[in-house]
Amino acid sequence: VTIADRTKERGSVAGETRSASLLACVVNVSEGRDAAFLAAADDCTASSRLDRHSDPDHHRSVFTLAGPSLEADVARLARLCLTRLDLRRHEGAHPRLGVLDVVPFVSLRGNPTEARRARDRTARLLAHDLGVPVFLYGPERSLPEIRRSAFRTLEPDLGPSRADPRVGATACGVRGPLVAYNLWLDPRTPLARARQVAAALRGPEVRALAFRLGDRLQLSFNLLDPQVVGPAEIMDRAASLVSVVGAELVGLLPAAVLARIPPDRWGPLDLDVTRTVEWRLAGHGLLEPVPPAQAD
């Protein structure tokens, strides 16, 4: 998260700062197993990192970044990925374009155009300074469209027209706050049935995929409008169609989304106030603490 033109004045309401803009970047990296690499990635993002979620099955890590050094830390993480990772050796369940796979900027408060400007600056750095093909998403197109069409019917927006097979390409985007969320199914469920359920649950607010991960079965979601369809709603909808045995929050969620869910459901849904964006921002001195009941 970065705060542009941030003033020293705090808002009078808990959870508010008076600032021109409040941005986040949620960097998805195609590495979820190498402890030495992940330690180096933690080090180079230490000043802005709100959270890191690493998944060895998907072989993927998600870094939620915040703070005045946001763009510098994204650049440091990008250079580390391009130097240390090799897409040719990558094996994982999750679709990926490159070692630095997805770099979305998110406007949390203030002028949404600031997120697009940050995206465009980062895209130019990746393409022109680091030589990575960059596909833009947001107003231009959706991320799923890039995954379907990159290097087939869709050329990179910036950078080389062909990707180095070692590092691949990057999707650099701008989007609203979403919740990444996984549900674990009864492993005896056929994968074909899990895919049917994923298809049934997809909609304007929900992207869904089904994966067999060893002896486990997962539904993986991006909840694009979590105020409409959040973790509780997707759990209830899925449980009406298939046997669900567990849940997993990937990264963080907005406090306002948590506030909509009865606290007695937080545990089974793998949710907690300490895993809200606002709680982590407060821990970095970027925002006053926000009790979930006060989020709006």
What are these regions (language model features)?
Residues 9-12:
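Short linear segments in intrinsically disordered or otherwise low-structure-confidence regions
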